[in-house]
Amino acid sequence: MSARSKARRRALDILFEAEQRSVSPLEALKARREKTDTVVAPYSVDIIEGVMTQGEQIDEFLGTYSQGWTLDRMPAVDRMILRIGAWELLYNADVPDGVAVSEAVELAKMLSTDESPTFVNGLLGRLQQLKPTLLA
């Protein structure tokens, strides 16, 4: 697993924990740093801050283009994977679009239901197609 893949996984863990505990992701990040000797990779912090900053717009896009699913009905882990993937796809120019989608699908394969990778791939693929108009 590459350093960036590990950073994505760590960011996912922190974002998921924050939502489950109903705390700010930055508060969860701070608690994680205080609890463990593990250094949180700078890219994990970038993801967390990016998802927080762009979260409303990301959720709007996900809600608009997910077919048959509202954000509230999605499994929480899928919701976090999609938020990370959408942030990388739409707002992080350092990550190629295909990599953003592929990495999100891999997280879904490792951590979610059997149907989740297909759902994540389809929704992020749709956002990738619409990217020029979404950010215009």
What are these regions (language model features)?
Residues 1-136:
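N-terminal interaction/assembly modules
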